[in-house]
Amino acid sequence: AESHNDNSLRDPSPFIQTNLVGTFTLLEAVRRHKVRFHHISTDEVYGDLELDDPAKFEPTTPYNPSSPYSSSKAGSDLLVRAWVRSFGVEATISNCSNNYGPYQHIEKFIPRQITNLIDGVRPKLYGAGENVRDWIHVLDHNDAVWDIIEKGRIGETYLIGADGEKNNKEVVELILELMGHAPDDYEHVADRPGHDMRYAIDNSKLVEELGWAPRFTDFRSGLQATIDWYRDNEAWWRPLKAEVEAKYAAQGQ
């Protein structure tokens, strides 16, 4: 899937082709071959929540996407539901909150800050940094998807989150602290247009039906392990760095 919001604002076309046409192509293939299908999606299809709102996203929350990326994912979710109902495709859907951990593309928020600091560049924080994300370690996400594939009910949607709400300012300050810098040693840059304020997942359906539970519940230690991974695996991300930063620089970010 195409999954980076900033890229969808620069050029929405690949998101339509990959996330919508790509999902249609896969659905037709599984319909033809009569195989089980699991569709991985995002909590961004639900739009956003107010910072002081106690509510969380639930499987029944109405869709309200706000970007080309989230709109393309919402459309792909609806295609899956239609193929289940219209053609009897055996499929499930999961909508997950923000991931972190090893092997994440360095255009993403956390690895970008880590690799900038490795390069001696101050982290960049969009706007005031008040936007809240519900962080989950990628290995917990993987475990949840496997549980859904093995035990999930056909046609159902499961929300994946680990109760890891933190605003972007808190995350940047923790990265700085863990990497030996003053917690205020970052730059404020222009905010993303239409930047969603808060995401939060109600994972009770996943927990109660399938017995899933996150293993990486300490964000600080998970983030430290992630920092260590990027330090130890520069050969993996280094070839991507210049191009990623050039794209951000063109937008003043």
Which sequence ranges carry the predicted segments?
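The catalytic Tyr-centered alpha-helix of NAD(P)H-dependent dehydrogenases
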Residues: 65-72, 96, 102, 106-110, ...
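Structural element of the ATP-grasp superfamily
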Residues: 26, 80, 113, 206-207
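N-terminal Rossmann-like NAD(P)+-binding domain of SDR-like oxidoreductases, especially those catalyzing
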Residues: 1-99, 225, 229-233, 239-253
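A glycine/serine/threonine-rich, flexible loop-to-helix segment
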Residues: 52-53, 106-114
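Hydrophobic alpha-helix immediately C-terminal to the catalytic Tyr-X-X-X-Lys motif of short-chain
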Residues: 75, 79, 83, 113, ...
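C-terminal substrate-binding subdomain of Rossmann-fold SDR/epimerase-dehydratase oxidoreductases
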Residues: 117-253
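Conserved active-site region of classical short-chain dehydrogenase/reductase
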Residues: 20-28, 107, 139-142, 146
